[in-house]
């Protein structure tokens, strides 16, 4: 009898001890990053709203989320409603996006709006008469009207339904081309093609579609009296040629319109650096210390233009399980760069959003996540448990 009681007592004490360990106070990552001037966030898909473990991580350690696809135009635009609209302007279905923003609001997280204008994967019918891809393209005038209406409706919807939750928008995404994707005479390098496919925004509106998008976004934010920051977002932003073209573009955006007194209106507040760091689908180029200097220089260069900077889609790539310690060391050094650039009074870096949050050790080389994020690149393992790299970053931030 005594032995049975002893066993029962042990069984009762084991879970209690486990709970005690789990309940030990943890410093949220975002509290540590905010002490250095920048938010800490992660990506969230609609399906992850049912992943309780990941949601708990976001609630505990993040103060920002970005919807991976659900706030993009191709997810929001509703063809049947657009065709039936009385004013000929586009209409949207916000149901999935609303659930995600509502979750953020309920749990005290801000949302990066991503993204208003992006040529990739865009619904073709948006550019055609009667919203029918089988009919001719609309005129520049009509396309500008549709663009203004779309941007105005989307920003207004989220601000009025969830006041203050969407704290910034990527207004335009990846408009700066590379290689032969732009007119060499254009210092902004506005892309005319992507992977051999024409940029329909460029073809229907012209190369100034970016400036108009920012004008419409700024006018909407001003009319709402909202505190929403407006970003231009792109990849390869820390390489010199792309960086210089982005600077030329932001200068063009911020000199495009004037206020009532004739002074230039600042339409663009900052640059989103996507932050896919390392080889695309290959270990070659991963954890290259030279990238740390490039990132630091890029942040400072954009800041010198009066722009704030956010790392918006960060994945520190690693494809080799044997190099997880090297990966952790590189990640810590990267966060040291973030802290260092913010040591002055201006603190130009205002946010870091990690998209390569999880390990995918069984990913195949042909998959999208393999190429974009790598297999052993996460702050969390494949089960969503924080890895040593996560705690090493926390320890460094506490120093």
Q: What does each model-found stretch correspond to?
A:
Residues 46-61, 147-157, 242-258, 295, ...:
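Short, acidic/polar
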Residues 4, 61, 162-165, 267, ...:
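Short loop/turn motifs at secondary-structure junctions
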Residues 94-95, 102-106, 203-233, 238-322, ...:
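Glycoside hydrolase catalytic-domain groove-lining segments
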Residues 43-55, 74-77, 82, 88-95, ...:
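Acidic-and-aromatic substrate-binding clefts and catalytic sites of carbohydrate-active enzymes
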Residues 3-20:
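Sec-dependent N-terminal signal peptides of Gram-positive bacterial secreted proteins and lipoproteins
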Residues 28, 77, 157-160, 164, ...:
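Aromatic-rich peripheral "rim/lid" segments of glycoside hydrolase catalytic domains that contact
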Residues 30, 60-81, 87-237, 307, ...:
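Substrate-binding cleft and catalytic face of glycoside hydrolase catalytic domains
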Residues 22-64, 68-70:
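Boundary/entry segment of secreted carbohydrate-active catalytic domains
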